[in-house]
């Protein structure tokens, strides 16, 4: 991992009326270079996030020290001149200060134009972890992140209330997304039951989750707020010298305590066999309960964890693409096992 040897400009959010060459942006963020020429090599990185124009890895040499510098630039297009959640999060200076469990790439700055947000962060190298093997590490990091986020939100002036309100998980523009509406998949499950007798009658049983999820959402809405990363996938985590690095805040929300644990376990449930999932779930929940800050109610946090776990697991296990994937791999028995777990352990 290479980091810029000198601090960026005092304010890491810069406003521009139009896009400028990359070198101009870097000089604006790092004024100590005094406009000296930079020999930059760039490489596009993979990205499938909504509204992302591109993600690029830039390499160049610090003209003052001669040391190598590696920076990631992410361009996120705006809709109706409204910036992205991720750009707003990176403008929340100091929120991650004091973190000891996770490591985060330093944000060098955010450049806002009317049409896009450009986010510049340090480049992180490391080995992607086996997600079930880091359950305890994640539990400690998530508990710390929730504590830091809640403290930061409580310290904000009233003038930031509209911005934070717009980032809240319970705004309609988030809740209407397909991934948070598993009930849309029930007609497909009913058809699956007609085609395959081992799935007969399951759609009617899964309908019981509709009122349950409404109840859990109401309880979660009233619980303590914090920042929630919401995207604990292998591609967003790296291990470097024993430290766990968390990147990519494209799904960040003003969430609730417990949400990130549910997001992690929901993703694990979607991808792993039941034995692997159950072992990791037990390890995660035990460590999370121990690490949870005293300011939070344990029962409330675990209830919120259950809510987001179900949101994630129900949609990803019921959607037609998942059913087809299991059919092609001849693993419909495993899918049926996951359905039984959801119906038996979660209702």
Task: Give the positions of each predicted feature.
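Juxta-kinase regulatory segment immediately upstream of eukaryotic protein kinase catalytic domains
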Residues: 2-42
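Short Pro/Gly-enriched beta-strand edge/turn motifs at strand-loop
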Residues: 33-42, 89-93, 181, 210-222
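Active-site acidic catalytic loop and adjacent metal/ATP-binding pocket
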Residues: 46-65, 212-259
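ATP-binding pocket architecture of kinase catalytic cores
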Residues: 63-164
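Active-site catalytic-loop/activation-segment of kinase and kinase-like phosphoryl-transfer enzymes
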Residues: 160-216
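Active-site activation/catalytic loop segments of kinase-like enzymes and analogous catalytic loops
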Residues: 258-295, 309-337
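Acidic, serine/threonine- and proline-rich low-complexity regulatory regions
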Residues: 293-305
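Membrane-interface aromatic/basic loop that binds lipid-linked glycans or pyrophosphate carriers
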Residues: 334-347
